[in-house]
């Protein structure tokens, strides 16, 4: 179901289906397989795609898979490797259903320092998120359209714009 929803969401955003990369890793069970396997999968994707910019989950997301993916990406993107040196920017993003459910006083809270203006894209973002029918809930659940709009509105208001997405800068090589 998730794969079909991803394809539909990416179609809405204008991402060609053939550019979507899937790997057969267990959902919600990444910590059940050896970390070196996850690192290799992430490294191979990075090496294949050769991105300049990498977006990764927030380090203290409650979802363990998010933490595993972040760790694997950090290892794969180390600047001591040719593959890692090609990545000039790394940003951690917030996930409504995971980032703010951690225990802020024992782990760091999400304190963004980069904001992208999405005033022209908020409706497209909402439409793309709505493609994930199996994941979307109704208000007041955090996985609802109203929460997505509210977060974009809040992040935008912090920077004096209508809507924004917020990130934590991890790396900026200039």
Functional labels for PLM-detected ranges:
Residues 1-86, 92, 135, 150-151, ...:
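Active-site beta-strand->loop->alpha-helix modules in alpha/beta enzyme cores, enriched
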Residues 5-17, 86-174:
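The feature marks non-catalytic terminal segments
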């Amino acid at each position: 179901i998730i794969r079909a929803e991803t394809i539909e969401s990416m179609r809405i955003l204008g991402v060609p289906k053939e550019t979507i990369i899937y790997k057969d890793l267990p959902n919600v069970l990444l910590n059940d397989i050896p970390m070196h396997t996850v690192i290799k999968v992430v490294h191979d994707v990075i090496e294949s795609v050769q991105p300049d910019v990498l977006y990764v989950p927030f380090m203290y997301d409650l979802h363990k898979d998010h933490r595993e993916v972040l760790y694997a990406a950090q290892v794969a993107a180390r600047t001591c490797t040719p593959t890692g040196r090609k990545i000039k920017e790394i940003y951690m993003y917030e996930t409504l259903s995971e980032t703010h459910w951690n225990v802020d006083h024992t782990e760091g809270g999400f304190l963004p320092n980069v904001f992208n203006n999405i005033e022209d894209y908020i409706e497209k973002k909402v439409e793309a998120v709505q493609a994930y029918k199996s994941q979307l809930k109704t208000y007041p659940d955090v996985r609802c359209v109203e929460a997505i709009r509210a977060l974009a509105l809040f992040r935008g208001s912090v920077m004096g714009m209508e809507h924004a997405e917020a990130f934590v800068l991890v790396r900026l090589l200039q």
